[in-house]
């Protein structure tokens, strides 16, 4: 589940009309949401608030072996008046990302007077204290600058300066294609990411209704200090919202199953990965991924799904035993046409949503995650089961160890890998 600050940053991207799907880093976003989700560790509590339309605060307290926490502040010159900030009103599907419906490429927004800016800082406690800071600025309708700083304080007796790393990212998005240029002070790393969308250019042909989208992208990294070279390329084919039902009600059946196909290749390491994700119904999605290495002949298979559950709570009517007197009084005071109360429509009822995510790999490592709303609290609970490693050999070794311990009378191997609960409240 996204924390409150990530949710506000998502609202900032929507407010500046930035298409997050038009980026190479989002090429496999759907698969990552359905298969690479993380479960909470131990117990963690989040308290957040949107104090003003431009300023937000967040406090986190957790117990992961020891008590630790963080303090976060965020400021933006873009107002968040229309952004739900109360935990009881925030749409759960925005906080629990699942199947990601890719939107059609759009033309850059028209230039406005004020340039959107966002400042975000997080201080992690206790020592070693770590400070993370983020600066975002929309330079132009097609350009965005991002500066991320991470500084860690050394040991208490150390007199050396705190270690700090600066990551600079410049994004150029035209709708038809996007380029990202990166530089990190860690080993003087230079990077580039690019994505190209096949089809008409939305800047010149924005009225064309497209049913599918084919995108190709690549990334490359180089460090002159450590002589590090990295490279990858990928393809994505997905259906667009125009291919499905145009009804605004998300509970109605869809005419065409939205699906996403991806293919990624890392030539230097010989890794090849393919994935297929489908939204079988408005509340059910499946995903699978197969990875193969041509050098080591190792393979990986992962499958998972997410299931959304919706429940409605009807309005509670108080019965104090005097309804007969009110009905008799209405006969004399109220016309007969208004005696029958209007029925409560489904939109007036309170709707509660929750989601269950399950993933399993070829080594029978299982993760289960439940996320939902309890009263005005957002709760995320998860558990991990299976061998600690994700390689097929670890599963065989664990089976052999379990058999040896069983024959010698020792305790059986535990497949319990951890459980955690995260509770969030925002106002």
Curated annotation (Swiss-Prot):
It is found in: Mitochondrion outer membrane. InterPro entries: Mdm10. It is a multi-pass membrane protein. GO terms for cellular component: ERMES complex; SAM complex. Keywords: Membrane, Mitochondrion, Mitochondrion outer membrane, Transmembrane, Transmembrane beta strand. One of its GO terms (biological process) is mitochondrial outer membrane translocase complex assembly. Residues 393-427 are annotated as: Disordered. Its main location: mitochondrion. Belongs to the MDM10 family. Component of the ERMES/MDM complex, which serves as a molecular tether to connect the endoplasmic reticulum and mitochondria. Components of this complex are involved in the control of mitochondrial shape and protein biogenesis and may function in phospholipid exchange. mdm10 is involved in the late assembly steps of the general translocase of the mitochondrial outer membrane (TOM complex). Functions in the tom40-specific route of the assembly of outer membrane beta-barrel proteins, including the association of tom40 with the receptor tom22 and small TOM proteins. Lacks alpha-helical transmembrane segments, suggesting that it resides in the membrane via beta-sheet conformations similar to those predicted for other outer membrane proteins and porin. This is Mitochondrial distribution and morphology protein 10.
């Amino acid at each position: 589940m996204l924390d409150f600050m990530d949710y506000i940053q998502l609202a900032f991207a929507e407010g500046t009309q930035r298409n997050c799907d038009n980026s190479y880093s989002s090429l496999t976003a759907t698969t990552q949401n359905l298969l690479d989700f993380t479960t909470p560790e131990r117990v963690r509590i989040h308290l957040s608030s949107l104090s003003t339309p431009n300023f937000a605060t967040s406090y986190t307290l957790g117990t992961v072996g020891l008590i630790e926490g963080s303090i976060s502040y965020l400021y933006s010159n873009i107002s968040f008046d229309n952004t739900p900030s109360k935990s009881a009103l925030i749409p759960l599907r925005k906080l629990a990302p699942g199947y990601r419906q890719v939107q059609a490429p759009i033309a850059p927004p028209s230039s406005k007077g004020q340039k959107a800016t966002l400042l975000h800082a997080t201080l992690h406690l206790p020592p070693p204290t770590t400070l993370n800071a983020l600066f975002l600025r929309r330079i132009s309708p097609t350009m965005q600058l991002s500066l991320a700083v991470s500084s860690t304080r050394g040991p208490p007796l150390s007199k050396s300066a705190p270690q700090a790393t600066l990551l600079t990212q410049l994004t150029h998005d035209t709708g038809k294609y996007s380029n990202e240029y990166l530089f990190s002070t860690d080993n003087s790393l230079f990077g580039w990411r690019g994505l190209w969308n096949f089809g008409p250019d939305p800047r010149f042909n924005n009225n064309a209704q497209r049913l599918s989208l084919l995108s190709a992208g690549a990334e490359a990294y180089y460090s002159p200090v450590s002589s590090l070279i990295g490279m990858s390329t990928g393809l994505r084919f997905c259906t667009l919202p125009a291919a499905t039902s145009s009804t605004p009600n998300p509970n109605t059946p869809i005419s065409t199953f939205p699906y996403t196909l991806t293919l990624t290749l890392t030539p230097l390491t010989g890794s090849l990965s393919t994935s297929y994700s489908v939204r079988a119904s408005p509340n059910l999605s499946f995903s699978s991924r197969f990875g193969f290495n041509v050098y080591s002949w190792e393979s990986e298979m992962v499958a998972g799904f997410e299931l959304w559950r919706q429940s409605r709570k009807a309005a509670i009517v108080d019965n104090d035993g005097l309804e007969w007197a009110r009905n008799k009084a209405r006969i004399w005071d109220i016309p007969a046409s208004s005696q029958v109360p209007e029925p409560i429509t489904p939109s007036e009822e309170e709707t509660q949503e929750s989601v269950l995510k399950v993933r399993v790999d070829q080594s029978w490592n299982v993760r289960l995650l439940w996320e939902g709303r309890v009263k005005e609290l957002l709760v995320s609970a998860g558990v991990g089961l299976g061998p600690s490693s994700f390689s097929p050999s670890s599963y065989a070794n664990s089976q052999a160890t379990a058999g040896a311990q069983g024959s010698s009378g020792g305790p059986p191997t535990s497949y319990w890998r951890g459980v955690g609960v995260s509770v969030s409240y925002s106002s």
